[in-house]
């Protein structure tokens, strides 16, 4: 599996983009099955990866955090059934408090350092080209910005960059183990996640002057007319970084060809979510509704059992289906609590695996799609209450839950998927403000509930007012929440009958 972070579907040639240079993604679409209705589940980074391990949504119960003691982990299940699993990654959130036990589920793992302010090198003097916070890059916390530029000073050549090192480690694993049977390799790079640090040779593919603005790291905020030039700059940088990702995708495909792996080796190419680059007058994610640019994702699967090439599937699939597909490939029974479904039959004949699917962020809109419509249910009150975290692992992205948060903890009855374990119930009003959104108040309430017809309005510019469709989508939402054993107060927060 080759996994990218924040890879935009609408920026790829197989999904209709005619200006981003990414020939290997087109080559991949000709080799594999391309999914046209692939959606996220839980977001952003670590919640998406928890979905990838467990095959079930987690955003209704807690925010960003580690795997829980009761979670089923796909890589660990493979490992325990005699299938060695290996992770190579530069996704530095794995080495932080809020992601600290994902990589340990694999049989073995290797890392490369230096992405997005990763606290890697400890240089006490500023790099020569450091853009001090009185320049174009004022939006970043000074310590994160400085650390990122310190890291860059140690990447003088492309081969020193995290994506290059990560893919090289993955190719090394293939070289050593390609003759063996039954193994799982996850090559996971943080690119094309921001900041958009990219070698010049990929920028040279575009007719654009990248030197005119010294800023490659978008803020998470609403934008105005004065931001249009910077928006174009970010979009071009993102395109150049996608071209870099495309190059390394090509290396993986080339090596599979050289080693004869296409005959018996599944390849999955996926992402966790997308990223807004000015659409809907926003940059980034998490601070706004989860529009298609974020929630509707690229997904490609080559299954050597059926050898389906160049086909497009229109069935609704999600991140939670990937672990189910992998377990099925190795003839391993799916855990009882896994909600994702294997996609083998979908690849062959577009067999549906669900009527509708949930997606969202803890404490924000709860969204449901049937592949035709997207319904975004907003909080029913400006306080966005009641809202709780349910966990045995009280950690945010970069730090533990605060003492004040933990002082609100009580023990709640087990959920259907916690294997008889009661869990801590912690008031989310003291949230850590670390992109998990827990504890935020009126922001999502002010956006209101939204309904879109994404077949006729894929850019979601024209919200629908259709009582009949909304009623059907509410029923999909309610049933999916019940199936996920959502906490009762989530229904109350959204103004829904349970």
What are these regions (language model features)?
Residues 1, 99-110, 116, 143-148, ...:
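Active-site regions of oxyanion-processing enzymes, predominantly non-cytosolic
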Residues 1-33, 42, 79, 447, ...:
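Active-site-proximal N-terminal segment of extracellular/periplasmic enzymes that hydrolyze or transfer
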Residues 18-21, 40, 65-72, 232-244, ...:
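A short beta-strand-to-alpha-helix junction
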Residues 20, 195-208, 255-318, 354:
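Histidine-centered active-site microenvironments of extracellular/periplasmic hydrolases
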Residues 22, 52, 159, 163, ...:
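Polar, surface-exposed loop/tail segments
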Residues 49-156, 360-361:
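Catalytic-site neighborhoods of secreted/periplasmic enzymes
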Residues 160-178, 219-265, 329:
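A long, amphipathic alpha-helix that forms part
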Residues 292, 362-465:
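C-terminal, low-complexity/hydrophilic appendages and adjacent surface loops
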């Amino acid at each position: 599996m080759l996994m990218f972070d924040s890879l935009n579907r609408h920026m790829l040639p197989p999904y209709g983009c005619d200006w981003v240079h990414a020939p290997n993604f087109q080559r991949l679409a000709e080799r594999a099955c391309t999914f046209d209705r692939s959606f996220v589940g839980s977001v952003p980074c670590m919640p998406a990866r928890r979905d990838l391990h467990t095959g079930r949504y987690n955003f209704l119960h807690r925010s960003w955090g580690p795997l829980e003691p009761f979670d089923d982990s796909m890589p660990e299940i493979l490992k325990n059934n005699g299938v060695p699993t290996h992770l190579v990654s530069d996704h530095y959130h794995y080495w932080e408090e809020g992601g600290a036990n994902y990589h340990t589920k694999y049989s073995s793992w290797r890392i490369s350092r230096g992405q997005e302010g990763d606290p890697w090198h400890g240089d006490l003097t500023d790099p020569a080209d450091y853009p001090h916070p009185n320049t174009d890059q004022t939006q970043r916390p000074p310590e994160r910005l400085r650390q990122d530029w310190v890291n860059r000073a140690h990447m003088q050549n492309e081969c020193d960059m995290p994506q290059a090192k990560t893919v090289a480690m993955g190719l090394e694993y293939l070289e050593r183990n390609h003759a063996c049977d039954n193994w799982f390799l996850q090559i996971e790079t943080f690119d094309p996640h921001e900041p958009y640090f990219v070698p010049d040779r990929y920028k040279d593919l575009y007719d654009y002057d990248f030197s005119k603005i010294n800023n490659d790291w978008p803020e998470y905020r609403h934008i105005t007319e004065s931001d249009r030039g910077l928006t174009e700059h970010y979009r071009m940088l993102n395109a150049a970084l996608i071209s870099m990702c495309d190059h390394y995708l090509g290396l993986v495909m080339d090596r599979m060809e050289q080693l004869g792996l296409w005959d018996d080796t599944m390849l999955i190419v996926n992402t966790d979510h997308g990223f807004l680059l000015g659409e809907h007058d926003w940059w980034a994610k998490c601070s706004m509704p989860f529009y298609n640019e974020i929630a509707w994702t690229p997904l490609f699967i080559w299954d050597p059992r059926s050898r389906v090439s160049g086909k497009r599937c229109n069935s609704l699939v999600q991140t939670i289906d990937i672990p189910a597909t992998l377990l099925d490939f190795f003839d391993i029974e799916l855990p009882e609590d896994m909600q994702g479904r294997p996609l083998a039959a979908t690849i062959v004949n577009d067999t549906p695996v669900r009527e509708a699917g949930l997606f969202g962020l803890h404490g924000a809109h709860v969204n449901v799609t049937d592949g035709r419509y997207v319904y975004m249910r907003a909080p029913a009150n400006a306080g966005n209450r009641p809202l709780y975290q349910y966990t045995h692992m009280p950690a945010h992205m970069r730090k533990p839950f605060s003492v004040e948060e933990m002082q609100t903890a009580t023990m709640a009855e087990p959920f259907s998927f916690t294997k008889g374990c009661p869990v801590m119930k912690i008031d989310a009003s003291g949230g850590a403000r670390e992109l998990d959104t827990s504890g935020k108040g009126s922001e999502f309430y002010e956006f209101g509930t939204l309904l879109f017809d994404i077949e006729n309005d894929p850019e979601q510019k024209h919200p629908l007012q259709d009582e009949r469709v909304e009623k059907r989508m509410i029923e999909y939402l309610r049933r999916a929440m019940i199936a996920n054993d959502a906490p009762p107060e989530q229904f109350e927060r959204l103004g829904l009958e349970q």
